[in-house]
Amino acid sequence: MQMLQQLSPCGFVMATFDTCEWARALMPWHDDAVSRDEEVGLHSRDTLCFILNELLPVLRSRYGNLPCIIGGYSLGGLFALWAARETDAFCAVAAASPSLWIEGWMLYAQAHPLLAKCAYLSLGDREEHCRNQRMCRIGDCVRLEHELLRMQLVESNTTLQWNPGGHFGEEAERTAKAFAWCMNRIKG
């Protein structure tokens, strides 16, 4: 929170919620490479409904109709990009190291334009150099997502930032940078 305050002069309200079964709550569809649990991929719509029908109404009743940025790290970033293609409730997406390597993501993204006005993507510069054959595609997947977003949005309303390191490390800092970039974009 402190880093976010340092990175953006904008006032903000931050709301988070716990997902005990994060893969179940955030995966938009099943992928055995993420989990063999058959429940994975069945509950992202429930999570989105919670945000739209419970969380956002409470926030709006307390703070007014503020712009809403959705974001997260890893599967949270994937969920944010998916959610912002399913509803226009979000003005921006802060996707730090999103898990875009899942099976079927690029076909989905090509068929479903982002409904938010701006999007931040980031990736660690060593993430695509892992041994896992599925996950090592992440660099190409994020570059393709960025190209899609550049075609859909005003070019200045999307960015792809490369961070030093792999997937694990400085997750909070990377996520704060993503949200700050979005906040600075929508403040005007």
Predicted regions and their residues:
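Serine-hydrolase catalytic machinery in alpha/beta-hydrolase-like enzymes
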Residues: 1-62
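A conserved amphipathic alpha-helix that caps or lines the catalytic cleft of carbohydrate-
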Residues: 4-5, 84, 145
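Short helix-capping segments at alpha-helix termini
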Residues: 6-10, 62-63, 88-89, 113, ...
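Alpha/beta-hydrolase-fold serine-hydrolase catalytic core, especially in secreted/extracellular enzymes
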Residues: 31, 36-39, 155-156, 173-174, ...
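Gly/Ala-rich beta-loop-alpha elbow adjacent to hydrolase catalytic centers
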Residues: 71-76, 80
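Conserved hydrolase catalytic core segment
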Residues: 82-92
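A short, hydrophobic beta-strand element of the alpha/beta-hydrolase
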Residues: 94-96
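The feature captures the conserved acid-bearing segment of alpha/beta-hydrolase catalytic domains
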Residues: 99-182
